[in-house]
């Protein structure tokens, strides 16, 4: 098993409801370690840049609006197979399809307000981590 890093974000719907600690607890219980974390309020430009991969999708404007509507917590997680483990703990994008006990099944309000984001591959993890953190901000 490989120790790897992944990017994780707690979205505005969850921070508004003061769920940051509960979500981090679920991640830590799964064996993931937070090695960098900061609370940010994304500007529209930051949200557009971060989600540029979706710029041609019909939901892009709504996504940018939502992500810039309140604070988020961006973080770097580390652990064995961290990318897959984080995605497993988050659950399916649509909370209606998420397994019991996952973050999205427990906390998400809808498919749009689904409480968390996580990288889906090593390449996207590296890009997303670099978008929000300098190397000196990650302390393992």
From Swiss-Prot:
PROSITE patterns: NDPK, NDPK_LIKE. It catalyses: a 2'-deoxyribonucleoside 5'-diphosphate + ATP = a 2'-deoxyribonucleoside 5'-triphosphate + ADP; a ribonucleoside 5'-diphosphate + ATP = a ribonucleoside 5'-triphosphate + ADP. Its cofactor is Mg(2+). It is found in: Cytoplasm. Its main location: cytoplasm. It comes from the Bacteria. InterPro entries: NDK-like_dom, NDK-like_dom_sf, Nucleoside_diP_kinase, Nucleoside_diP_kinase_AS. Its EC number is 2.7.4.6. CDD domains: NDPk_I (cd04413). GO terms for biological process: CTP biosynthetic process; GTP biosynthetic process; UTP biosynthetic process. One of its GO terms (molecular function) is nucleoside diphosphate kinase activity. ATP binds at residues 11, 59, 87, 93, 104, 114. It holds the Pfam family NDK. The keyword Repeat does not apply. One of its GO terms (cellular component) is cytoplasm. Keywords: ATP-binding, Cytoplasm, Kinase, Magnesium, Metal-binding, Nucleotide metabolism, Nucleotide-binding, Phosphoprotein, Transferase. The active site is at 117 (pros-phosphohistidine intermediate). PANTHER family: NUCLEOSIDE DIPHOSPHATE KINASE. Belongs to the NDK family. Homotetramer. Major role in the synthesis of nucleoside triphosphates other than ATP. The ATP gamma phosphate is transferred to the NDP beta phosphate via a ping-pong mechanism, using a phosphorylated active-site intermediate. This is Nucleoside diphosphate kinase. The lineage of its organism: Bacteria, Pseudomonadati, Pseudomonadota, Alphaproteobacteria, Hyphomicrobiales.
């Amino acid at each position: 098993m490989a120790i790897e890093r992944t990017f994780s974000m707690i979205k505005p719907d969850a921070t508004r409801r003061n769920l940051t600690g509960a979500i981090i607890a679920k991640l830590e219980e799964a064996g993931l370690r937070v090695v960098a974390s900061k609370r940010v309020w994304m500007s529209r430009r930051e949200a557009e840049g971060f989600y540029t991969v979706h710029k041609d999708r019909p939901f892009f404007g709504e996504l940018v609006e939502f992500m810039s509507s309140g604070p988020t917590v961006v973080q770097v997680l580390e652990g064995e197979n961290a990318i897959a483990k984080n995605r497993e703990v988050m659950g399916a994008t649509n909370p209606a399809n998420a397994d019991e006990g996952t973050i999205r099944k427990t906390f998400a309000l809808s498919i749009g307000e689904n409480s968390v984001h996580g990288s889906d591959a090593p390449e996207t993890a590296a890009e997303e981590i670099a978008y929000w953190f300098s190397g000196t901000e990650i302390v393992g």
